[in-house]
Amino acid sequence: MRDAENIREVEALGIDMMGFIFWPKSSRYVSERPAYLPTRCKRVGVFVDENTETIKQIADDYALDIIQLHGSESPDQISHLPFLTSRLSIVKAFNIATTEDLVATKLYEGSVDYFLFDTKGKSVGGNGEKFDWSVLSTYKGETPFLLSGGIGPEDANRVKVFHHPKCIGIDLNSRFELAPGHKDINKLKTFIQSL
């Protein structure tokens, strides 16, 4: 999300969180602060293998509520982010294709507030590809998670019937865009109303 008017329109839909990508290799990269930042939903900063000082600076500059780590950050690295854990929630993303991919979550139990389960794809997130959600039935961890990975307008019924005691929400990204970083308000509105 980069465009102030688009941010306002998405926020008006009553969403809980809005993501801002701070990974320079992403087509959704936020290179400069938008003229408007949301005030009625949580601001999520998405980082990929970023250094601690940069995360801290951006978290302060954007008044972030949540940090999403979408790279190969280790539990040890996360434990060295005390400035985050005292005032911000942390989400650790995992790329999922099979039940074996869920094993790594055990190392992060107690280190983060939420997991995000995304599709294992060619790039880091935003691939627009789905994974088989049935593999999540084997997830028995204590950490709540967000469901991600190519969820599109056609998936409303799938989302409605998906149940897991630790699933707290869904992440909508590339399948709801007019262009990278610019959401299609009509698609989002229709999808949200259908839930």
Task: State what each model feature region is.
Residues M1-L195:
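Conserved N-terminal beta1-alpha1 strand-loop-helix module at the mouth
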